[in-house]
Regions:
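Catalytic-loop motifs flanking and including active-site residues across diverse enzymes
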Residues: 8, 39, 81-86, 162, ...
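Alpha-helical scaffold segments in soluble metabolic enzymes
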Residues: 11, 15, 41-45, 88, ...
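Conserved ATP-utilizing enzyme core subdomain
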Residues: 75-167, 236, 249-264
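Catalytic phosphate/nucleotide-handling subdomain of diverse soluble enzymes
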Residues: 69, 88, 168-251
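Phosphate-binding/catalytic loop of phosphoryl-transfer enzymes
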Residues: 2-6, 11-14, 18-97
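A glycine-rich, Thr/Ser-enriched phosphate-binding loop motif common to dinucleotide/cofactor-binding enzymes
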Residues: 31-41, 158-169
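Glycine-rich phosphate-binding loop signature in dinucleotide/nucleotide-binding domains
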Residues: 49-52, 152, 177-179
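Generic structural signal for well-ordered alpha-helical scaffold segments
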Residues: 43-48, 147, 164-175, 231
Length: 264
């Protein structure tokens, strides 16, 4: 397995004059892990509760969950698409970068035949730990699923079904992994009020909100996670990613690229 990380840390360190830590995923992969998800390392550090089950749900292009159970158990994995398919579809038909508050999707209706086709994706049945990305869930994947239908739904109904797909895959994973508890969303999808409401309806008895309610800006949590990982590496601390990526042992993630001043 191989992961290509964009951005050259040598150039970043040289031009900014700041010691840079980068390329976190490949060390995890070298230790037998999948290289993702890594943000759960911070989730367990700052979001766990000793007396409540909690889940942190990061909805970026891909959605992932971190289960932080009160008994100390930790599980994290990618559930499937987050915003990626909805963003692709609305960009194609409306020229927008994203469906603000899920408004376009809300005006449509879920097509059950199309939803069933989406839910037949084999990745969804794999056991954790598992990770995925745009190499699977992309425009070509969506076209293949649509091509299997006898009749295409309207573009707006497709958008409604894609929102339901994200909500269903997330809620299914959460219900299977956690009995009751609190669910906090972060990432760009946390701003999609229609998606947040739909997840709440699919999970009666659970509290559903955003990480802002536990003191963390939903837009900053992933950046915070990598800053925290960088500090662990600078301090010479190995981190245990085994519950999340399947790595065989704790490792120090990323390489250190000194600033020009510290290197001289």
């Amino acid at each position: 397995p191989f992961s290509l990380q964009l951005g050259d840390p040598n150039t970043i360190a040289e031009r900014t004059g700041i010691t840079t830590v980068a390329d976190f995923r490949r060390r995890d992969m070298a230790a037998g892990g999948q290289g993702a998800p890594l943000a759960p390392l911070l989730h367990q550090h700052c979001c766990a509760s000793p007396n409540k089950n909690r889940a942190i749900v990061n909805i970026g292009g891909i959605a992932n969950i971190t289960l932080l159970l009160a008994n100390g158990a930790r599980v994290a994995f990618d559930t499937g698409p987050g915003n990626v398919l909805m963003d692709l579809w609305i960009a194609r038909h409306n020229g927008a970068r994203f469906d603000k508050n899920g408004e376009w999707a809300t005006g449509g209706s879920v097509d059950t035949a199309f939803l069933a086709e989406l839910m037949s994706e084999p990745y969804l049945a794999l056991a954790a730990p598992k990770s995925t990305g745009r190499e699977l869930f992309n425009g070509a994947w969506l076209e293949q699923r649509l091509a299997s239908l006898k009749q295409w739904p309207s573009p707006q109904n497709i958008q409604a079904t894609l929102l339901e797909f994200t909500a269903t895959t997330l809620s299914t994973a959460l219900l299977a992994g956690m009995r009751q508890g609190e669910i906090y969303l972060c990432g760009g999808g946390a701003h999609n009020t229609a998606l947040l409401k739909r997840i709440g309806k699919l999970m009666p008895g659970y509290y559903v909100g955003t990480t802002a309610e536990i003191g963390i800006d939903p837009d900053w949590l992933e950046a915070m996670a990598f800053a925290w990982m960088a500090q662990q590496t600078l301090d010479g601390i190995a981190v245990d990613t085994s519950p999340f990526t399947g790595a065989k042992k704790p490792v120090m993630l990323g390489g250190i690229y000194p600033s020009p001043t510290s290197a001289s």
